[in-house]
């Protein structure tokens, strides 16, 4: 399979938009992008807004030419209700909009689904689906993070022959056992992982959450067929991310497993625009009127 990371936090936007191609089929997972509305008390810098616009065009272009779209939950960095044409006539696997879902996501799901009625919508939770050479499996809903405050997400496994990719969606770690179970059972060759939310360490993410996440990632490295772990999203909102999980990097090196972010996977340097927002405002000041408009 050909794996194309389109939009990720290491590429300057909030997203995990991923495209997979195999034998003439194209699958797009979570075709959406967004920006953190406030960071360090600052709105997105114009450089971030430019990146958002250019990246969305990339996502949209690949999504339009995809056969299958997957929506793992209803946050705006994972689905886009404002571009319903994107979904028209496509098979769309979605997180169940009525069960194991919090109020905010249920409301967003209702609006989203009212906009994409021309799509072939399939509830994905816990399901398995075949498309020619591809098999797509979904986990049961797992926490978005370490509790139910932000609702639930579904993890996805896509396989073609001996090649398999697991996409975790927003597990923020993974710190919880049931988030890890699906990964261990699927034993992918490539894991696209939403890593620990260390930029909130001590606030909405505890040292214990980080410890559990590190142990779980090491467990995955040591007990599956994984050869590449793409760790990104929440993890790449921390400018000091590389210093947070030294045990993971050591275990991966010992096991011959690559651990890297999406930008590095495609040969680019990480571009953590949100984490560098204060720096952006210092190096490229924004006029007072522009700031107010944001």
Curated annotation (Swiss-Prot):
InterPro entries: RibonucZ/Hydroxyglut_hydro (IPR036866), UPF0173_UPF0282_UlaG_hydrolase (IPR050114), UPF0282_hydrls (IPR014426). It comes from the Archaea. SUPFAM superfamilies: Metallo-hydrolase/oxidoreductase. Signal peptide: none annotated. PANTHER family: UPF0173 METAL-DEPENDENT HYDROLASE MJ1163-RELATED (PTHR43546), UPF0282 PROTEIN MJ1629 (PTHR43546:SF4). Belongs to the UPF0282 family. This is UPF0282 protein Mthe_0376.
């Amino acid at each position: 399979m050909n794996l194309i990371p389109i939009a990720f936090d290491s590429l300057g936007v909030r997203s995990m938009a991923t495209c997979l191609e195999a034998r003439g089929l194209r699958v797009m997972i979570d075709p959406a992008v967004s920006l953190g509305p406030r960071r360090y008390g600052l709105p997105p810098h114009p450089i971030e807004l430019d990146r958002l616009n250019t990246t969305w065009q990339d996502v949209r272009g690949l999504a339009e030419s995809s056969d299958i779209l997957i929506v793992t939950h209803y946050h705006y960095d994972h689905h886009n209700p404002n571009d319903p044409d994107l979904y028209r006539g496509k098979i769309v696997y979605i997180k169940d909009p009525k069960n194991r879902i919090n109020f905010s996501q249920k409301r967003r799901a209702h609006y989203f689904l009212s906009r994409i009625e021309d799509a072939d919508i399939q509830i994905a939770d816990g399901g398995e689906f075949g498309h020619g050479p591809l098999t797509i499996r979904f986990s049961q809903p797992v926490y978005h993070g370490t509790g139910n405050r932000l609702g639930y997400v579904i993890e996805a496994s896509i396989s073609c022959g001996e090649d398999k990719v697991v996409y975790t969606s927003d597990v923020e770690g993974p710190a919880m056992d049931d988030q890890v179970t699906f990964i261990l059972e699927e034993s992918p060759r490539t894991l696209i992982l939403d890593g620990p939310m260390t930029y909130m360490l001590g606030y909405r993410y505890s040292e214990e959450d980080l410890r559990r996440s590190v142990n779980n990632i090491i467990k995955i490295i040591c007990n599956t067929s994984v050869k590449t772990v793409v760790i990104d999203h929440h993890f790449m909102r921390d400018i000091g991310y590389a210093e947070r999980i030294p045990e993971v990097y050591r275990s991966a090196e010992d096991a011959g497993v690559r651990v890297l972010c999406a930008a590095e996977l495609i040969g680019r340097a990480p571009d953590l625009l949100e984490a560098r927002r204060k720096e952006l405002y210092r190096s490229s000041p924004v006029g007072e009127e522009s700031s107010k408009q944001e």
